[in-house]
Amino acid sequence: MEATIVLYTTKDIEAKTTTKLHEKLFGKIQKSNYGRYEYEVKGILPGGAYVRPVRAVIIVKKEYYQDVIDLFDAYGVKHRSFNIKVDSDIFKNNKFF
């Protein structure tokens, strides 16, 4: 399966901006009323579209690559990307190792 590995750094960005970036990328669980209610806020990457083998590295399916790059450019994140071939099983299990 064709995929893209994206390496990025958030070293030059503020911590709160990095948090917002990750929330938009992966989504979050928002709790209200002291944790009584939970709402899932979805990100641009659905669950089976990416794998994070280590911090600051994402392996994404080809169809989501441009969305990730557009988000990184909007936040001023430095990144590099390479096209790779991977087994489709890593996206099903969401584990690389």
Could you say what each language-model-derived stretch is?
Residues 25:
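Acidic, metal/ion-handling microdomains and their immediate structural contexts
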Residues 92-97:
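Short, low-order "capping/linker" segments at domain edges
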Residues 1-21:
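Short S/T/G/P-rich N-terminal loop/turn motif that feeds into the first structured element of a domain
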Residues 12-15, 65-67, 86:
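Generic "edge-of-domain/loop-turn" microfeature
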